[in-house]
């Protein structure tokens, strides 16, 4: 089976971008709650 590099990159970005966005929001919320 041939690996589609562009497909892997697109999938990785599709997963990582929303995940990192949620992590940033979570960290900001935690920081505000600690104040």
Curated annotation (Swiss-Prot):
Membrane disposition: Single-pass membrane protein
Gene responsible for this protein: psbM
Native source organism of the sequence: Oltmannsiellopsis viridis (Marine flagellate)
Keywords recorded for this protein, A-Z: Chloroplast, Membrane, Photosynthesis, Photosystem II, Plastid, Reaction center, Thylakoid, Transmembrane, Transmembrane helix
Example GO biological process: photosynthesis, light reaction
Function (record text): One of the components of the core complex of photosystem II (PSII). PSII is a light-driven water:plastoquinone oxidoreductase that uses light energy to abstract electrons from H(2)O, generating O(2) and a proton gradient subsequently used for ATP formation. It consists of a core antenna complex that captures photons, and an electron transfer chain that converts photonic excitation into a charge separation. This subunit is found at the monomer-monomer interface.
Protein name per Swiss-Prot or TrEMBL: Photosystem II reaction center protein M
Subunit note: PSII is composed of 1 copy each of membrane proteins PsbA, PsbB, PsbC, PsbD, PsbE, PsbF, PsbH, PsbI, PsbJ, PsbK, PsbL, PsbM, PsbT, PsbX, PsbY, PsbZ, Psb30/Ycf12, at least 3 peripheral proteins of the oxygen-evolving complex and a large number of cofactors. It forms dimeric complexes.
Record-level GO cellular component terms: chloroplast thylakoid membrane; photosystem II
């Amino acid at each position: 089976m041939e690996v589609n590099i562009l497909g892997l990159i697109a999938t990785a970005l599709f997963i990582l971008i929303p995940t990192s966005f949620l992590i940033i929001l979570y960290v900001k919320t935690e920081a505000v709650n600690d104040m």
